[in-house]
Amino acid sequence: AFSGILADADVAAALKACEAADSFNYKAFFAKVGLTAKSADDIKKAFFVIDQDKSGFIEEDELKLFLQVFSAGARALTDAETKAFLKAGDSDGDGAIGVDEWAALVKA
């Protein structure tokens, strides 16, 4: 899903680092997969991969399954992780993360 954007080894290492429930930290994850160092274009491409229903927003249900977008065998985020992730990214309070909010979150 992220070929040409992220290195497989970086993705594997990032997923391994948050295998345990409630160990997910979006800043650490973005750094480990190499997303924070990417161009604005690549960060937008990643958004559209994660926006599974192509609504133009990443909703709570998509955030819950965020890790599985990187690897089908990865765990779902816990409710606490999902809510914290959404709260961090949803700067306008509409209950979803838009592409500009996503870009700001990745670079935060």
From Swiss-Prot:
Pfam family, any one: EF-hand_7
SMART domains: EFh
EF-hand domain sequence ranges: 38-73, 77-108
UniProt keyword list: Acetylation, Calcium, Metal-binding, Muscle protein, Repeat
GO annotation, cellular component aspect: cytoplasm
GO molecular function: calcium ion binding
Bilayer-spanning residue ranges: none
Binding residues annotated for Ca(2+) 1, in chain numbering: D51, D53, S55, F57, E59, E62
Keyword Metal-binding: yes
InterPro entries assigned: EF-hand-dom_pair, EF_Hand_1_Ca_BS, EF_hand_dom, Parvalbumin
Residue list for modification N-acetylalanine: A1
Record bears the keyword Cell membrane: no
SUPFAM superfamilies to which the protein is assigned, alphabetical: EF-hand
PROSITE patterns: EF_HAND_1, EF_HAND_2
Coiled coil stretches, renumbered: none
Signal peptide from the UniProt entry: none
Binding site for Ca(2+) 2: D90, D92, D94, A96, E101
Record-linked PANTHER family: PARVALBUMIN, PARVALBUMIN ALPHA
Other observations noted: This parvalbumin has an isoelectric point of 4.2.
Family: Belongs to the parvalbumin family.
Function of the protein: In muscle, parvalbumin is thought to be involved in relaxation after contraction. It binds two calcium ions.
Name of the protein described by the UniProt record: Parvalbumin beta
Origin species: Merluccius bilinearis (Silver hake)
